[in-house]
């Protein structure tokens, strides 16, 4: 970004702006909240959780002072339970289904109680599970996000030799690189990774899986390994590669300096090297999903003078969750509705000067929004090329990998899950798909049907 600025705020102010928006419960608060729970039989909160955490059980253990037991219940059903305690949309999942809410009372703060228990386990470095007796079988997992981590944990507990291939320097996927810093720091996802690593799972970082490459070819700091070799080395392969780069706008000026994508911006913020994050004085963010909200709020908290979110539909159509939208409004973000970007105009130095939009309210009026930085948050591309050319598996018309009920792809021995299958959902959904894939892999390799925590027939 040629015309680059950095945050005008001092480090102390920035640190304060990026402190977690939902602080941890104190012991007294946790005990009070846990004792409000009715411990429902066939609890609707458990049914509303995609990983089916036994919510009454873990809350009851908090009430009795058994925090390690509580954390075990959580991580048994969801290996990224600490992450989900912070980033899950609990108001539309577990807390949204709480019986107290149906009685017109305040729902139990399930998310914060979940954080209380999982923080206790991770801060104490407690290992909650043990590696299973080696069974002589090996599984390779491509990607270390929620789906990959979940699959790895369950397979390791069953005795599989598990290797995770991750193209980045740190494992954790979007939990590490893509969550707004005020929601969750990288230390949380790394603590969950450590839980999995302690089960004997190997993480090969800076390693990219490609169509064809010599064994362990090194290009710069990145190792390249061919997918064919993965199939030779392992009895099964699980693809948990998520989604690709941000979609293109396909408008004039998109390649100018000062135009960045939201994921790269958020990733830069995650380094916490605050003064190195390129930041315009006036920032326009295109899109209105949860990633767009993360971008506008973080730009504002870094000290941008003006931040505007631009969306082609009306306010009532905003795809972001209500609480995310309210946060952006509270932070002083401005909104332009029913405006579709049609071009980016340059200043004298060739960098972005304004975003030209066409009104979608029927007037076709042109609107220029002055800005010196534009952030694209318009969804991510599907990795169709990777799946068809590298892995050789079938994708649907939207570029999503086609799987059966056991998460197996069209190619025997190859499984897939997470955003690359569902097109992009919550971290908790990806975790559940990783769990289902581990079950499917075990069934395929041993013929033994097995169900993990969160299933009425759970066996481990």
Regions found by a protein language model. Give the residues of each.
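Feature captures the FAD/FMN-dependent oxidoreductase FAD-binding
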Residues: 133, 138-142, 190-251, 343-354, ...
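Beta1/beta-strand and adjacent pyrophosphate-binding region of the FAD-binding site
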Residues: 133-147, 279-286
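Residue-level detector of alpha-helix initiation sites
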Residues: 79, 145-147, 289-291, 421
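Ferredoxin-type iron-sulfur electron-transfer modules and their immediate structural context
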Residues: 1-138, 239-255, 274, 346-352, ...
């Amino acid at each position: 970004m040629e015309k680059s600025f950095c945050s005008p705020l001092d480090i102390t102010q920035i640190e304060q702006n990026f402190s977690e928006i939902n602080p941890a419960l104190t012991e007294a608060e946790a005990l009070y909240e846990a004792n409000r729970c009715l411990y429902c039989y066939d609890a609707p909160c458990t049914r509303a959780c995609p990983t089916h955490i036994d919510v009454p059980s873990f809350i009851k253990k908090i009430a009795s002072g058994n925090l390690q037991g509580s954390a075990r219940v959580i991580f048994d059903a969801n290996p990224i339970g600490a992450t989900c305690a912070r980033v899950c949309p609990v108001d539309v999942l577990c807390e949204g289904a709480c019986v107290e809410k149906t009685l017109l009372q305040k729902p139990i703060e399930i998310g914060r109680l979940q954080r209380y228990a999982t923080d206790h386990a991770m801060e104490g470095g407690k290992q909650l599970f043990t590696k299973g007796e080696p069974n002589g079988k090996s599984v390779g997992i491509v990607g270390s996000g929620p789906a990959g981590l979940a699959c790895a944990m369950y397979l390791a507990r069953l005795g599989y030799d598990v290797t995770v291939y991750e193209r980045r320097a740190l494992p954790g996927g979007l939990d590490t690189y893509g969550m707004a810093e005020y929601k969750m720091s990288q230390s949380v996802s790394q603590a969950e990774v450590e839980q999995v690593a302690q089960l004997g799972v190997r993480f090969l970082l800076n390693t990219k899986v490609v169509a064809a490459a010599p064994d362990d070819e090194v290009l710069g700091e990145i190792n390249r390994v061919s997918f064919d070799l993965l199939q030779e080395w392992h009895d099964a392969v699980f693809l948990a590669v998520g989604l690709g780069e941000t979609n293109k706008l396909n408008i004039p000026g998109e390649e100018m300096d000062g135009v960045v994508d939201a994921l790269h911006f958020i990733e830069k913020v995650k380094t916490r090297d605050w003064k190195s994050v390129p930041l315009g004085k006036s920032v326009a963010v295109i899109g209105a999903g949860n990633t767009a909200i993360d971008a506008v709020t973080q730009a504002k908290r870094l000290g941008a003078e003006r931040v505007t979110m631009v969306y082609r539909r009306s306010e009532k159509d905003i795809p972001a969750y209500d609480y995310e939208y309210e946060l952006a409004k509270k932070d002083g973000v401005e909104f332009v509705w029913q405006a579709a970007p049609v071009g980016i105009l340059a200043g004298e130095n060739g960098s972005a000067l304004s975003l030209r939009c066409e009104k979608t309210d029927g007037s076709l009026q042109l609107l220029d929004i002055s800005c010196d930085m534009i952030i694209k948050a318009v969804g991510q591309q599907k990795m169709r090329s990777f799946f068809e050319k590298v892995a050789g598996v079938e994708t649907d018309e939207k570029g999503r990998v086609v799987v059966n009920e056991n998460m197996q792809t069209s190619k025997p021995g190859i499984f897939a899950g997470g955003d690359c299958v569902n097109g992009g959902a919550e971290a908790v959904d990806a975790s559940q798909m990783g769990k289902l894939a581990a079950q499917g892999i075990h069934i395929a390799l041993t013929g033994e049907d097995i169900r993990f925590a969160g299933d009425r027939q759970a066996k481990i």
